[in-house]
Amino acid sequence: MARYNRWQNRAMMEEVARLGAVERMAPRGAHWGSIQGTMAHLLWADHVWMSRLDGWEAPHARLEDSAGFVADWSEYRSKRQITDARISRWSQGLSEADLAEDLSWYSGTAGREMTVPRAICIVHMFNHQTHHRGQISAMLTAAGVLTAPTDLFLMPDLVG
């Protein structure tokens, strides 16, 4: 899923780059407001989850401020690429034992301590990406941008 996530994030950045700053930041009725706001929220969420899963520094921004996590488009693109590369390297080192462990943290969203199997947390992180990329895809389509295929079986390194 890390490879798929990286592939899709690259494609989405290329698609979003066709828009100007005003179009990227335009309110579009999505939960995180704009295309760029939704993308920033996803980057923020990856950093939150990786702080729990692999000891990364947690973002200082709170959930409600996550749409502004990275406001500059060039900085966003750089951080997204670095983040995806780090997640890919981390995922390659996971073992069955790692996946079988529980992960405990305080969830601000749930308002309590959580203990969940690490494998479920990892699936959630990638599922969260897919959920919001679907929203971004819909916003891009509404803005007249043709989006690339998102089917997992079409990922280039899976297609023979």
Indicate where each model-derived feature is located.
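Helix-adjacent hinge/juxtasegments
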Residues: 57-99
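Carboxylate-rich helix-loop segments that flank metal/cofactor sites and access channels
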Residues: 96-111
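Short, contiguous alpha-helical
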Residues: 2-66, 108-160
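Short leucine-rich amphipathic alpha-helices used at interfaces
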Residues: 1-2, 76
